[in-house]
Amino acid sequence: QELFEELQSENFHVVAVAIDENTETVSELAAGTSYPVLMDKDHLLTELYAISNVPSVIWIDENNMIARPAASEVGTDTFTEITGMSRETHMQQVRDWVRKGVLPDDASYSVPDLSEEEVQARLHFRIAAHLRREGREEEAGAHFDRAAELAPLDFTIVRASMPLRGGDPFGEEFFELYQKY
């Protein structure tokens, strides 16, 4: 929010996309933002941009071209003690890009295509989410399990399934996943 407010007069825009099914929780987290926050309950963005971790950012320029591909970045220092990641480096990179047209070195990174296992994992996740919405919890569980087997370190699958299965995406289960990552 702070960076958006700082740079919006320089034609800088933020669009947040929550890769989540819980609109109530996302709405609470989005309270007070003045930029759009969209919901992607079907994880389409993760497939389009090969996103496997959250939070991730994609920089898109005024010509609708990707200036920097998906990168794991944070917008707050809430979890700095856990992740060791500070927001300030990323924030300064954004300022330099907006004001000077300078891109960070990793902007030329080519995001590899999803592997066959990752594609299959995402399909299983989608099936599981659909089955869960239909009230078919047991069948959904089998597909969530298979998705996690195929892509065990994909946060957009493993962590995203936690609240859908009654787990806490910020609890012990998450920290176990984070340690593996």
Question: Where are each of the predicted segments found?
Answer:
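Structural microenvironment flanking redox-active thiols in thiol-disulfide oxidoreductases
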Residues: 1-31
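Short, internal strand/loop/helix patches
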Residues: 27-54, 58-60
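Thiol-/selenol-based redox modules, centered on thioredoxin-like
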Residues: 61-136
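Short coil turns that delineate tetratricopeptide repeat
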Residues: 118, 150-152
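Alpha-helical linker/edge segments of TPR/alpha-solenoid repeat scaffolds
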Residues: 164-181
